């Protein structure tokens, strides 16, 4: 070790001296003595590494308190940070899918602050069932006999198969053997549930006779899977649920359906693409239907199964149900969301998912044009800002081929360098509330469909 290195090491302050510095008092009050001491030890280790490797003091040596403040603030940030979603995907899986209605947020807050009647019957002063209140509500909305709630739709499909067809064959059209995000595949789920997959038909065409011919003494279910994240077009043929139910009745085999996204309203009345409705499948006689809570329904992540009382009872008594059950916060948010459907006249305003999906292209374009001048004043030296038409998507595997006309603010670098776009997008991701867009065709696009809090957005963008 050189004398110069020893001199540098000797300039490092003692932790006790730093702790008594007035600049550290507020940090100790806010973050606690233990956190601050642990951080200072790490900072001293970092400083020694810098001296050893560069023969200099660290850049932040002159202001230990400021460096400590920055590090503590960064460490205190939640792993689940709010962002401004301007990707053009409304139900963005990586960004948490459906935004919750104010009623759902308030219901969750109340459920977290006090004991609740999760599994307590006030009438009989005994144990109740956690799904009962929601089951009553779901039956009222869908026309089903009973309902069961688990933590997501993948769990719902697993439970549905394991409880009703373990050790038996499940007949599914080859064109419906879907894979969703995370390599979740229907054949894999069937194996985990103890079922044997019996494929029928071809990728593009399946007939009623294919189901009839597949049924044998070991058939447990006939299953329909809604291809919510892809579409097969052209020379195609499928068997609708109502026809499959008739086959099931004829052969005494229950019919179940995985609806995936699941919609409780006719989306076409809002000018949106039509999606199969739960009520239609229940009316057709499907024994069990599963769907997601956090997609088109607009609620929290949950798997919902509605259908025949006797088959729901099989699900409720299966050992997997306890492992997959939803917690009180999920149930509180889901109940509040479902209650919004009892007032359909106000649904498009109160349910954030539907409100965002139904925004008109004209209103989105007007919003983008209104903000353009202020953003150009901030970014115009490096980028050309334009308001351009674009197409939003619903996301989360919902209506995969359908797009929603929208408008975007685009940023094009004057020098044409793509690295400037990457740097700009990276800079926005470091904002206190990160702004997330997408880079495409030599531009950075900010689709304004999901922008509701303009003031927060402009505060971030003009920093």
From Swiss-Prot:
State where the protein is found.
Cytoplasm
Q: Which top-rank group of organisms is this from?
A: Bacteria
Q: Does the keyword Transferase apply?
A: yes
Q: Name one Pfam family in it.
A: SelA
Essential cofactor(s): pyridoxal 5'-phosphate
What keywords would UniProt list here?
Cytoplasm, Protein biosynthesis, Pyridoxal phosphate, Selenium, Transferase
Q: What top-level class of enzyme does the UniProt entry assign? A: transferase
Location (main, coarse): cytoplasm
Q: Which residues carry this modification: N6-(pyridoxal phosphate)lysine?
A: 295
Pathway stated in the Swiss-Prot or TrEMBL entry: Aminoacyl-tRNA biosynthesis; selenocysteinyl-tRNA(Sec) biosynthesis; selenocysteinyl-tRNA(Sec) from L-seryl-tRNA(Sec) (bacterial route): step 1/1
* Function field: Converts seryl-tRNA(Sec) to selenocysteinyl-tRNA(Sec) required for selenoprotein biosynthesis.
By what name is this protein known? Answer: L-seryl-tRNA(Sec) selenium transferase
Protein source organism: Salmonella paratyphi A (strain AKU_12601)
